[in-house]
Amino acid sequence: MIPTATYRLQFRNGMTFDRAAALVPYLKNLGISHLYASPIFTATKASTHGYDVTDANEIEPSIGGREGFERLVAELKAQGLGLIIDIVPNHMASSLENAWWRDVLEYGKESRYARHFDIDWSRRLTLPFLGDTFDAVLENGEIAIKPDPATGKPAFAYYDNYYPLAPATWQGREAEILALTDKAAIADLHERQPWKLMSWRDAARSLSYRRFFEVTGLVGMRVEDKTVFDDTHRLILELVRTGAVDGLRIDHIDGLADPKAYLARLRQEVGPACYITVEKILAKGEQLPDDWPVSGTTGYEFIASLAEVLVDDEQIDNLRQAYETVKGAPVDMRAELRAAKLLMVDRNFEGEFTRLLALALSIASELQIAQEESVVRQALRELLIAFPVYRTYGTAEGLPPTDICLLHRIVERVKTLETPPQPEALTFLSRLLTGDVPASSQEEATQFRVRFQQLTGPLMAKSVEDTLFFRQNMGLALNEVGAEPVTHHFSIERFHHEMKTRQARQPDALSGTSTHDTKRGEDARARLYTLTEAPEQWSECLARWRQMNQTHVKFLNDGTAPKSADTWMLYQALTGVWPPVLQPQDETGLNALKTRFEAFVEKALREAKLRTDWVDSNEAYETAMLDYARYLLAPDNQTFLQDFYRSLQPFIRAGLVNSLTQTVIKLTAPGVPDIYQGSEALNFSLVDPDNRREPDFATLAQQLDQLTPGVFSREESWLNGQVNQYVTAALLRLRQQNHELFRFGDYIPLRAVGQRADKVIAYARVNHDDALIVVAPRLVFAECDGLLSQSHSGFWSGTDIIIPGQLNQHRYRNVLTKERLMPGERLSLASHQGGVLVLMSD
């Protein structure tokens, strides 16, 4: 069954199955068809998100276990709602809490699970969980031989962790082993284990297993092996087959060795009715492979499409110039992207790159092709850096035709570099990737292809989303998962084109605007888009605020903190997160915001990897930056706070109009709208873990029944999210009543004419005799200096929407105001408050 709308709920951190069951009546009333659950399987005890699974065949006891899950399912079914769960086939926790992993540690290559995990068994399994080298930790007395409290067997004890010994190294002399205190003897015992403990700092260069991105605590799984697939999906398949679960969201599909084969096997097991979406980041213009048996993506590309509507393309260059003036230098985003990718290849993914290089050189040697290591290294490095998408989808048979064309374009681009790699090396690597090698080397070439494809995705994610987007802060709203790193022109025409393509290619994909992974909540993003409409006003504000807080800038050995570019980021981030109802005198509210903002600032600085890093933190710099950030929100900093609050008002109001437009589009454009918990009202969250905070469900449920069209005329209803919640509920119910229109209806752009024609977006959805007309405002910052609740009919005077022949014969009902009208050939906006119209044909 294809959902009409999903509601993402984050379990753990207090959210249990029973608490979720209590929310089901609210979700039904809101108009949701399917609850969309974060991972529910047993994860590490400290897990806050559930992606660090320790047992894929057990439901997490701390959130209610199997019995609690069954109660939730029963309540969902009683209310007529379905359930979608988030599954994680790519990885599990490399934790001692994981019985399979623990078995591998104890028995090494002889473990029944040795091939479940993606481990390089040509060497000892590396465990990068020490604070220093093994020798240093041993010398400091931090490690010893003790009985494991859980099993009683001898183990290497490091604080609260007990690493099991291989049976052959202790059985028959248990007392002797437990009595070991001599450091040389302990070191010798360590050398005889199938694993080796090492410093976490050495993971990037020495890890012997595939990890999720840079997270050593998450080990890759070999689900391409049927045994591994069966073992990791036993409970998942049971839940689908028994009808408890109606859909699956596949986490990090690009991490798998063969996504297509995995999805084909999964589809065969769950049947045609199961709704399947994949977490897949698509570049602009990129589409999912046609032969994947899924309904579509989880929708990050939809966020990027919305920017086409809400960014002022005519003024964004002025914002860019202002940013470069503050920064003190022009920004070459292509060069910045290259620098970020170089850092990832050379440092953060050094081990993965080295393994890939060694594999290529081994194949060259087998084929007796003369290739110098330095030459192949440069060619491989440049290919990885030049990759414009997350990955290709080659198999043992080679690359599909579209990916071969992509590879050829990349190679040609690499050849134009100022210092290009040798053509022979590029040709050799291309042959490995396309499978153009003798039969004797096909297996190794396939392995190279798989490893290459499993590296390009993490490389792209960590260099763009988690480095570049924290370094270059011209427009934080554009620094989002799924966004293009190199700024392009924005246009409604492109948005219309992308929606037509979406309707044709993946009409059942999720359309998300906030997730647990987005860099900021959808309404923070909507507000920050308005900076592109008023770059001069923003620049004047920034200069004034910097001057007000200048005395809190510190002078350090490596420069000032914050630097001018840092302040651009800080004030813009604060602009995005500031709650609309927060007053400068509200000390409690300021302190709550300060706690959230501090955590964001620390993460933003470390992700940028410029003056501090997760690997080597710069304490002096971080302290200075955090002190500055705290002062911004200090209750006694009233001169700044009053000015900030006053200056923010037009941005807040224009942002709320953007929020409404964004909501209307999400609920009426092609795709299945996904509501992230609490986002039916307003979501001004920062990057995780801030975006995983639980919303006030009690208030949301209580106010829903009280909402009427009158919310548009109450200023407080705009500021507290009631307008968005009312519109969300009204349109979700409309979707339920007109499922086929929204699923199959054509997407038809409508033309605006008149004085404010560039200030609206308009389109229709048409399926047989059913028609929907949607009109929403955009780029109205200049009109938002007054109250949102005021009528702005004068602003829209003389602006009409041209209604084509197949639509202008209908009578329509305004879904948001309940009025009825027959627009004819021209729909005048002057008589409709705010320019927001959702008209459903009678």
Tell where the protein language model's regions lie, with residue ranges.
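Hydrophobic or amphipathic alpha-helical targeting/insertion segments
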Residues: 72-119
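Hydrophobic "anchor" residues on beta-strands that sit immediately upstream
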Residues: 82, 247, 275
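Long, basic N-terminal domains or extensions that often function
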Residues: 87, 110-176
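Conserved short loop/turn motifs at secondary-structure junctions
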Residues: 90, 250-256, 716
